Amino acid sequence: MATSPVLFLLLAVFAAGASAATFNIKNNCGFTIWPAGIPVGGGFALGSGQTSSINVPAGTQAGRIWARTGCSFNGGSGSCQTGDCGGQLSCSLSGRPPATLAEYTIGGGSTQDFYDISVIDGFNLAMDFSCSTGDALQCRDPSCPPPQAYQHPNDVATHACSGNNNYQITFCP
């Protein structure tokens, strides 16, 4: 089966405009946390003082990253005191409240990204969340106000970042 030159050109143009975002996650807590992410990121242990990264493809919508605490896993199964996602190390479900959430939608190429912190599902850890060219958001306690974090579904706390950027999430800043 021959590949059409037009199809190849279209794929090349769309691929050139799309880019992934890297989310650098730092644990400043004095204990291990288990960051989790959906639809990208799964879950993993992150010791005190450690940093890890998650690559999120362009076009990812309604993503969220949170830190689980008080976890115990045997292989891929176990439980967490906060943010547990069905007893799995690698999450495919949202975490059980309470969990402080870093929420995002990644555009493609020059399309804008959007991000926010949400405590609608409760608060379990202080968090800083920033885009390399956007606002630095800080939520240090359950009462962090808009525009720093969503407290209620009708709050205005979403921030925009130009496309082709990376993000920093710090737990226990």
From Swiss-Prot:
Keywords: Pathogenesis-related protein, Plant defense, Signal
Gene3D superfamilies to which the protein is assigned, alphabetical: Thaumatin (2.60.110.10)
Disulfide bond listed as a keyword: no
Gene Ontology biological process terms from the UniProt entry: defense response
InterPro entries per the UniProt record, alphabetical: Osmotin/thaumatin-like_sf, Thaumatin, Thaumatin_CS
Pfam annotation, one family: Thaumatin
Induction details: By pathogen infection.
Secretion signal, residue range per the UniProt entry: 1-20
Domain of life: Eukaryota
Keyword Repeat: no
PANTHER family attached to this UniProt entry: OS03G0233200 PROTEIN
Similarity field: Belongs to the thaumatin family.
The protein's name: Thaumatin-like protein PWIR2
Organism: Triticum aestivum
